[in-house]
Amino acid sequence: MSYQDLKECKIITAFITPFHEDGSINFDAIPALIEHLLAHHTDGILLAGTTAESPTLTHDEELELFAAVQKVVNGRVPLIAGVGTNDTRDSIEFVKEVAEFGGFAAGLAIVPYYNKPSQEGMYQHFKAIADASDLPIIIYNIPGRVVVELTPETMLRLADHPNIIGVKECTSLANMAYLIEHKPEEFLIYTGEDGDAFHAMNLGADGVISVASHTNGDEMHEMFTAIAESDMKKAAAIQRKFIPKVNALFSYPSPAPVKAILNYMGFEAGPTRLPLVPAPEEDAKRIIKVVVDGDYEATKATVTGVLRPDY
């Protein structure tokens, strides 16, 4: 699919990787999960991102996952492949492999983690990937996970690269507003923070790359529709009820909460891979009460006052 198809996407789901109890990928669980997403307003799907537990997936496993999902999706929505690591050479090699594999609208490359590069180092990292790739690149800027932050100024330098088409931004609404105001016209801005989606869309973002859309896609779609129709009273009312659900979804290291909910809903999401562990049973029950049942009293026993902890 093309850039234009991607531009139409408002809700892109950062897809989990379903696992068997032994830690192997449960490929048989993928069709039901994908059909569930598509039935609840997912416009595009990101594979092998953070929510997919990509740090614990080998590249061979990622390619197997890509093939399985592509077979089910069959061109119905655009797909994005997670292609970046903290090793520029490895990222280049893998993005070339994914481009040759085919079937993706773009590749998502994360800001290098652990190395703590300078702004110039980050610029050169993404430039090298984009120069080498036949696949358009979206940058993933999430300092809560990688420690360093790609500044808006560096992002705008990269936005001028013809093969860097967008960013998944997980910094601040102030940064997002600055980027939206100063970016090239065709550069795509997605928030990666479910709790910020309401504000980001009102600022002019193109959409959200979401975890919550696994479980709350309908209300996200309803909120975005209300924003598009300038019904801010309705959109704000949805957002107020949505925030406790986001709090619950990120009250334990992700994707453990969303996997607990999907398992409860009858989908075979399975466990997480170490070093991540499932949410404790009592915590999982509270999370489910909030996210599925809308039991806001249960929020008193979950993380409150934040939209998304730095998990």
From Swiss-Prot:
Subcellular location, principal: cytoplasm
GO biological process: diaminopimelate biosynthetic process; lysine biosynthetic process via diaminopimelate
Keyword Nucleus: no
Residues the record marks as active site: 140, 168
Localization annotation: Cytoplasm
Keywords: Amino-acid biosynthesis, Cytoplasm, Diaminopimelate biosynthesis, Lyase, Lysine biosynthesis, Schiff base
Matches recorded under InterPro entries: Aldolase_TIM, DapA, DapA-like, Schiff_base-form_aldolases_AS
EC supergroup of this enzyme: lyase
Binding residues for pyruvate: 51, 209
Domain of life: Bacteria
Catalytic activities: L-aspartate 4-semialdehyde + pyruvate = (2S,4S)-4-hydroxy-2,3,4,5-tetrahydrodipicolinate + H2O + H(+)
Record's keyword annotation contains Zinc-finger: no
GO CC, one annotated term: cytosol
Pathway(s) where this gene product acts: Amino-acid biosynthesis; L-lysine biosynthesis via DAP pathway; (S)-tetrahydrodipicolinate from L-aspartate: step 3/4
GO molecular function ontology, one term from the record: 4-hydroxy-tetrahydrodipicolinate synthase activity
Enzyme Commission code: 4.3.3.7
Residue(s) at site: Part of a proton relay during catalysis: 50, 114
Similarity field: Belongs to the DapA family.
Subunit architecture: Homotetramer; dimer of dimers.
Function comment: Catalyzes the condensation of (S)-aspartate-beta-semialdehyde [(S)-ASA] and pyruvate to 4-hydroxy-tetrahydrodipicolinate (HTPA).
Protein name (database record): 4-hydroxy-tetrahydrodipicolinate synthase
Lineage, uppermost ranks: Bacteria, Bacillati, Bacillota, Bacilli, Lactobacillales
